[in-house]
Amino acid sequence: MEPAKCNWDGMDRLPAYERYARILMTQRILIIDDEDDIRQVAAMSLETVAGWEVVLASSGKQGIERASSEQPDAILLDVMMPEMDGPTTLLKLKANGNTAHIPVLLLTAKVQGPDQRKFAEMGVAATLFKPFDPLTLARQISAALGWKEGG
């Protein structure tokens, strides 16, 4: 059964608790990472902490295919992957009319200063660092989806 999709029209006029409840109830997150352990930990974190549906991809190519077919609400993308790295995957996602609107959050162990600015210019919603805290991960994705604490 398909999860209910949220009508985002007027979300900014709703009280914060209602926006958050709608976000929690409707989200499907695509995790693109070549490391199985990271995919599994991130998936378990998002399923447990936020109750979100998770779709997994082990490469940039597979991630682009899944993003187009699954239409996730957000994408968590590893920077360092073989064959097609995170930045290349990001550019292809943003160039595709079916996936350009999806917020992308980068997951990395190494991004510093200039790289973070470069990724922001490429349209990244946020950069998260490994190892990550499950609650922080859920909060960052929530923020990328339009929910802000206290607002």
PLM feature spans:
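Two-component/phosphorelay signaling modules centered on CheY-like receiver
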Residues: 36-55
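Acidic, metal-coordinating helix/loop segments flanking the phosphotransfer/catalytic sites
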Residues: 56-74, 91
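Active-site T/S-Asp motif of two-component receiver
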Residues: 77-78
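C-terminal output helix
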Residues: 132-141
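Receiver (REC) domain active-site loop signature in two-component systems and cognate sites
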Residues: 81
